[in-house]
Amino acid sequence: MQIDRLPVLSDNYIFLVLDPERRQAAVVDPAVAAPVLERLRSLQFQLVAIFNTHHHHDHVGGNQELLQHFPTAVVYGGAEDRGRIPGQQVFLQPGDRVNFAQRTAEVLFVPGHTRAHIAYYFPPVNHSSGELFCGDTLFAGGCGRLFEGTPAQMVNSLNQLRQLPDNTRVWCAHEYTLKNLQFALTIEPENVELQTRLAQVYLARQHFQPTVPSELGLEKRTNPFLRWDVPQVQQSVKGQDGIQTFTRLRGRKDQF
């Protein structure tokens, strides 16, 4: 399984998951169709699946046009997004499995950003890393805004993701890393690894290099939204427990 990253719009990423043996592809959260179609033409691959994490237009906007070119492609999304994802044919429940490229993804229910948000987790096989397509739930250095969910839901969702192996690659759907880490440093100014990461990301972005995928272990050590139970983070926002700490973090980030 190979993964191509397609930058689109101002800061979105579309991910094209490739099966070279079968010359087939699946696309994750196609905001628009044109770059996907162009890449598929250059590879001469057939699109067989569209994996949507949630219903926002910058994640599903390309569905219908892709289906016009590949009418047999199957559109997957969360069961609770019924009626909100264009062309959806498969309505996934938590714990469902999805097969592609001789790998099997587990469907994780991760509400918070939206009420129906799901993630696709491909566990490691042999010596490969796990692959997490988490949409707008977890970002490199941050997390998604809460549009339809509650802080308690988001903490539970992020805690699910936090349980995955440290070497899991995190394929989040936006290039928000620099601003996220600038905020994170206001919460943990003494976190040396965070300081180093911010410097590296700043340099990467100066050269227009992507910062996605990230690695989950790095997120656990430097992303405040996975560190709501770390004493230094709680003290920074005067949080009494995990949910209050997360709520105050999210409120500060919304104003940052």
Swiss-Prot record:
Enzyme class: hydrolase
Cofactor(s) needed by this chain: Zn(2+)
Pathway annotation: Secondary metabolite metabolism; methylglyoxal degradation; (R)-lactate from methylglyoxal: step 2/2
Keyword entries, A-Z: Hydrolase, Metal-binding, Zinc
Cofactor binding mode and count: Binds 2 Zn(2+) ions per subunit.
Catalytic activity annotation: an S-(2-hydroxyacyl)glutathione + H2O = a 2-hydroxy carboxylate + glutathione + H(+)
Keyword Metal-binding: yes
Protein residues bound to Zn(2+) 2: 58-59, 136, 174
Entry function: Thiolesterase that catalyzes the hydrolysis of S-D-lactoyl-glutathione to form glutathione and D-lactic acid.
Protein's GO biological process: methylglyoxal catabolic process to D-lactate via S-lactoyl-glutathione
Protein name per Swiss-Prot or TrEMBL: Hydroxyacylglutathione hydrolase
Gene Ontology MF term list: hydroxyacylglutathione hydrolase activity; metal ion binding
Residues binding Zn(2+) 1: 54, 56, 113, 136
A Pfam family that the UniProt record links to this protein: Lactamase_B
Oligomeric and partner information: Monomer.
Listed EC numbers: 3.1.2.6
Protein family according to the UniProt entry: Belongs to the metallo-beta-lactamase superfamily. Glyoxalase II family.
The organism of origin for this protein: Cyanothece sp. (strain PCC 7425 / ATCC 29141)
CDD domains found in the cross-reference section: hydroxyacylglutathione_hydrolase_MBL-fold
NCBIfam families per UniProt: GSH_gloB (TIGR03413)
Gene expressing this chain: gloB
